């Protein structure tokens, strides 16, 4: 199992790095759109769409929505994402209560649109936008930063959870997660943000805002993970798919990012660090 995970990671890493950091904006949009479309194919299964043709059709609908949003103001979609993730907090908190309201195939399919589409919009808003924070103007580093926030939060949560994780966060959704893990992840994210602020020669005020933005993003990333866990538990499946041998599916790898990316993109836009760009 470990060997399979390593081989898959070694194959995917250069593809991901090349697609994210070396493609022009339109190529980046197509590359990330392909990932989101594959994620939509997986989400169809989590929605209860079983027929292969129907799953493909759902993925194509999501791809069509992405195309239709190419010239729609990104900020409007990002605001929608923020309100959606606030609602998700209530859904996860009440589970299994309330599942009769969102448990239909149609409702879960719509949930997929609300998760996947804003993530793509947020990524491409960052990729095409103008960026300035401290002495940094490289928007590709923003994408790397939000990825790192999620990874740092996961690492901090893992070690804090193992050491102090007695009080469970959402035992009916994800029994392995603990409140200690959440706090440990947030502490790690705060330290990481302070270090990045120093490296970017940011002012004290900018660094403080970065810490706040990163903490909010870290919290929301937990919701992304919990939402997918809730849907898989409701559906009775362990992984979103087996597209990535040893790792499960694409959604199993990007669930936290689907929440973190649009929220972080919105926050830094409101702060004036990120401005709308052109294709």
For the regions a protein language model found, what residue spans apply to each?
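Generic detector of well-ordered alpha-helical packing
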Residues: 6, 43, 155, 226-229, ...
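Interfacial helix-loop-helix junctions of multi-pass membrane proteins
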Residues: 227-243
């Amino acid at each position: 199992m470990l060997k399979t995970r390593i081989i898959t990671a070694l194959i995917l890493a250069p593809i991901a790095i090349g697609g994210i950091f070396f493609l022009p904006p339109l190529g980046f949009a197509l590359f990330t759109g392909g990932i989101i479309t594959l994620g939509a194919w997986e989400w169809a299964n989590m929605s209860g769409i079983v027929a292969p043709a129907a799953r493909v059709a759902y993925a194509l609908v999501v791809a069509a929505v992405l195309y239709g949003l190419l010239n729609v103001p990104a900020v409007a979609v990002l605001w929608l994402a923020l309100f959606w993730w606030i609602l998700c907090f209530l859904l996860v908190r009440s589970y299994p209560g309330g599942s009769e309201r969102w448990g239909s195939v149609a409702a879960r399919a719509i949930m997929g649109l609300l998760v996947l589409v804003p993530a793509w919009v947020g990524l491409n808003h960052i990729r095409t936008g103008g960026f300035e924070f401290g002495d940094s103007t490289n928007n590709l580093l923003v994408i790397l930063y939000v990825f790192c926030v999620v990874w740092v939060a996961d690492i901090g949560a893992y070690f804090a959870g193992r050491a102090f994780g007695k009080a469970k966060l959402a035992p009916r959704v994800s029994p392995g997660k603990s409140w200690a893990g959440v706090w440990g992840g947030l502490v790690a994210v705060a330290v990481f943000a302070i270090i990045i602020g120093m490296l970017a020669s940011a002012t004290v005020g900018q660094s403080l805002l970065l810490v706040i933005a990163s903490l909010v993003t870290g919290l929301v990333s937990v919701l992304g993970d919990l939402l997918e866990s809730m849907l898989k538990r409701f559906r009775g499946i362990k992984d979103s798919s087996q597209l990535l041998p040893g790792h499960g599916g694409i959604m199993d790898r990007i669930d936290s990012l689907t929440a973190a990316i649009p929220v972080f993109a919105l926050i830094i836009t409101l702060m004036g660090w990120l401005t709308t760009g052109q294709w």
